[in-house]
Amino acid sequence: MTKRFTAFSHFWLGLAISIAPVGAWVAIREEISFTSLLLGAAVICWLIGFDILYACLDIEADRANRLHSIPERFGIETALKMAFASHAVMVVFLLVLLEPTVLLGWVYLAGVALVAGLLVYEHSLIKKDDLSKVNMAFFNVNGIISIGLMAFVIVDCVWV
């Protein structure tokens, strides 16, 4: 719905999805904490980044239907840069989660390094003049990121 009104619909989608980890945190810990909000912010940035990448495939349909998106408004080259910046901010948020009160350690840090590497790989697949690998980047790489980071967190919390 927001695509009818603003090019920043990617943000609203990210905000909607970020409610899940914050809500899970509240359900388990019965509090909203700085840590839960950092996790939510990381999810927002992750979703913004990959939704912008995927929206590059829809640029012509968006224009034909007078819908708004970052790629439609700013062009594919700028959209790719904005997606990369969003993913970089996500990694920063994930690194801030290493604060001492969160009790995550070196295994989690290795997971964040893997996520950062996968995001760089994801962005290397997509070129402004060749969007043929967007689906692979969107579905495969992001699937590995989500399951991989969860696995590293579980190992760090349970076995280390």
List PLM regions with ranges.
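Multi-pass alpha-helical membrane architecture of UbiA-family
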Residues: 1-160
